[in-house]
């Protein structure tokens, strides 16, 4: 998340704790994707006390016929917080959606960013997951009432010794456990778990489940169950040879198992989502060459983070290429766009 925009890295090969997908897997989940994209749908909006220059890291769930979106925002001083937006099902009013700034909610002043929102069905509560130095959570009975989120709490008493750096936290559960995934901005992809009945308490010591070169497994992870396949996918943000952001994908047959590369999506020319497999809708200029922190629109809104391959959509952050190259990172004017799957095989 907080990296120099003009980082240039020759992306090199990866080391995984697993093997590439075999024939049985290839029949259930595609390994090659192409997308179409909108222009910017959501741009930074300010008020009398918030001079916002970027909106980023969106997490969206469908609730009461509309999209509930929590996102990071960045002010003119380069400081991070979060905001809430409520958007029509077809995003037709996204451009005019008025943000609620989360630092107006008690306990949310200062650095809180990179949200994930979901309904935790076993407790009939909504959870907001985010980072504030530590991974934190808050609960609510109604995600459309951002002023009612509880005081943030830490998942851990302190940073575990097994972790050198942690960023971009994501929770997903199966029927037995809840898992906390995150990146390290260092090429490592981490996992911790707790019995589903203990959530949000009792997460064990995180372990590394996949590794690569720093910029080939960087940050911005999001993890999903793929409907009808028995497969899980993890999308992780990478940097291309000129610093462009794109997503690669890992897969696993269970959340606690081995994670392996999905086809050739680990390469900049053949990503899960990136400049080489996205075309913009008719009349829309190529407004970004970076497809950065965001996530797929899930089916439903609960802790299983389920997606359907027949209608994938990815809400991402992008930026004018010249502004992105100029940087520094905390002052890039990110906006939100929506990519829709065009084809896959």
Task: Show where each model-derived region lies.
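Positively charged n-region of N-terminal signal peptides that target proteins for export
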Residues: 1-6
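Bacterial N-terminal signal peptides
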Residues: 9-19
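Short, basic/low-complexity N-terminal boundary segments at the transition from targeting/disordered tails
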Residues: 13, 22, 34-36
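Sec/Tat signal peptide C-region and signal peptidase I cleavage site
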Residues: 20-26
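Beta-rich carbohydrate-recognition and catalytic domains
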Residues: 27-220, 225-286, 300-345
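Conserved glycosyltransferase catalytic-site signature
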Residues: 290
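Active-site pocket scaffolds in enzymes
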Residues: 293
């Amino acid at each position: 998340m907080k990296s120099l925009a003009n980082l240039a890295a020759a992306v090199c090969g990866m080391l995984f704790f697993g093997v590439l997908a075999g024939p049985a897997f290839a029949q259930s989940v595609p390994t090659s994707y192409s997308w179409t994209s909108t222009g910017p749908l959501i741009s930074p909006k300010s008020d009398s006390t918030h001079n916002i220059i970027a909106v980023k890291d969106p997490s969206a769930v469908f609730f009461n016929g509309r999209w509930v979106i929590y996102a990071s925002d960045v002010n003119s001083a380069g400081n991070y917080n979060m905001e809430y937006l409520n958007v029509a099902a077809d995003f037709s009013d996204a451009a005019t959606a008025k943000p609620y700034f989360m630092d107006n909610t008690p306990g949310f002043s200062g650095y809180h960013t990179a949200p994930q929102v979901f309904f935790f069905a076993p407790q009939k509560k909504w959870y907001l997951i985010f980072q504030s130095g530590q991974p934190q959570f808050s609960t609510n009975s109604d995600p459309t009432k951002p002023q009612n989120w509880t005081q943030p709490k830490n998942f851990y008493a302190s940073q575990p010794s097994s972790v050198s750096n942690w960023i971009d936290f994501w929770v997903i559960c199966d029927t037995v456990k809840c898992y906390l995934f995150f990146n390290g901005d260092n090429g490592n992809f981490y996992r911790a778990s707790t019995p589903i009945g203990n959530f949000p308490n009792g997460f064990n010591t995180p372990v590394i489940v996949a590794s690569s070169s720093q910029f080939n497994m960087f940050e911005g992870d999001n993890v999903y169950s793929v409907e009808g396949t028995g497969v899980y996918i993890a999308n992780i943000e990478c940097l291309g040879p000129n610093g462009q952001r794109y997503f690669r994908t890992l897969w696993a047959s269970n959340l606690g198992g081995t994670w392996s590369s999905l086809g050739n999506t680990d390469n900049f020319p053949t990503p899960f989502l990136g400049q080489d497999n996205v075309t913009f809708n008719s009349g829309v200029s190529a407004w970004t060459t970076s497809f950065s922190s965001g996530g797929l629109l899930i089916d439903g809104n609960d802790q299983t983070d389920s997606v359907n391959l027949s209608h994938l959509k990815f809400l991402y952050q992008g930026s004018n290429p010249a502004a992105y190259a100029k940087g520094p990172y905390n002052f890039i004017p990110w906006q939100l766009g929506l990519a829709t799957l065009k084809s896959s095989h």
